[in-house]
Swiss-Prot record:
Bilayer-crossing regions: none
UniProt binding sites for a divalent metal cation: D16, E17, D108
UniProt KW keywords: Cytoplasm, Endonuclease, Hydrolase, Manganese, Metal-binding, Nuclease
Protein name per the record: Ribonuclease HII
Annotated localization: Cytoplasm
GO MF entry, a single one: RNA binding
Record note on cofactor: Manganese or magnesium. Binds 1 divalent metal ion per monomer in the absence of substrate. May bind a second metal ion after substrate binding.
Organism: Klebsiella pneumoniae (strain 342)
Cellular component GO terms, alphabetical: cytoplasm; ribonuclease H2 complex
Function, in words: Endonuclease that specifically degrades the RNA of RNA-DNA hybrids.
EC class: hydrolase
Keyword Metal-binding in annotation: yes
Length: 199
């Protein structure tokens, strides 16, 4: 892994996404500029934290960060653009939504969206960079809450448990009940459930 050097500038935003792999719902992104005067203890990759810890940190991030913003790309945008381009669009939206313009943006992963300020992709940034960790927590808590809401509307799919990922249970329910309007029609298992697959 390449050595990461934190940029020597004041206003650094971290950006991360949640929801590239699921078959249903939006891909959700977050951008966060932390306040050096208000450190937050325990920031880490959201996937490595318990749900209870994520929720507590989410509240603390919203309270202490200089600013934060959420972005998203809806299922129809994912189907039109493909998941990679839709994710880049959602990241751009999160950065554009910040009330303070960052001087530098650090993105989790290996590629950056086109932004009007300097940016750098950081592999495993969600466990290496506090701003990206904070963004990953906001994005995951937001998307998980959306899946819980969707679960209330469509209780037989189990969205609250699998968050829309292609688990055996989700694939079985897709076969039994078909796709909802929230499913991503360009994804293979959904295509097959709708009878749209060419194979």
């Amino acid at each position: 892994m390449m050595e990461f050097v934190y940029p020597h500038t004041h206003l650094v935003a971290g950006v991360d996404e949640v929801g590239r792999g699921p078959l249903v719902g939006a891909v959700v992104t977050a951008a966060v500029i932390l306040d050096p005067a208000k450190p937050i203890v325990g920031l880490n990759d959201s996937k490595k934290l318990s749900e209870k810890r994520r929720l507590a940190l989410c509240d603390e991030i919203k309270e202490k960060a200089l600013c934060w913003s959420l972005g998203r790309a809806e299922p129809h945008e994912i189907d039109e653009l493909n998941i990679l381009h839709a994710t880049m669009l959602a990241m751009q939206r999160a950065v554009a939504g910040l009330s303070i313009v960052p001087e530098f943006v650090l993105i989790d992963g290996n590629r950056c969206p086109s932004l009007p300020m300097p940016s750098l992709a950081v592999v495993k940034g969600d466990s290496r960079v506090a701003e990206i960790s904070a963004a990953s927590i906001l994005a995951k808590v937001t998307r998980d809450a959306e899946m819980a809401t969707l679960d209330l509307a469509f209780p037989h799919y189990g969205f609250a448990q699998h968050k829309g990922y292609p688990t055996a249970v989700h694939l079985q329910k897709l076969q039994e009940h078909g796709a909802t309007e929230h499913h991503r029609r360009s994804f293979g298992p959904v295509k097959r459930a709708l009878g749209l697959a060419s194979n």
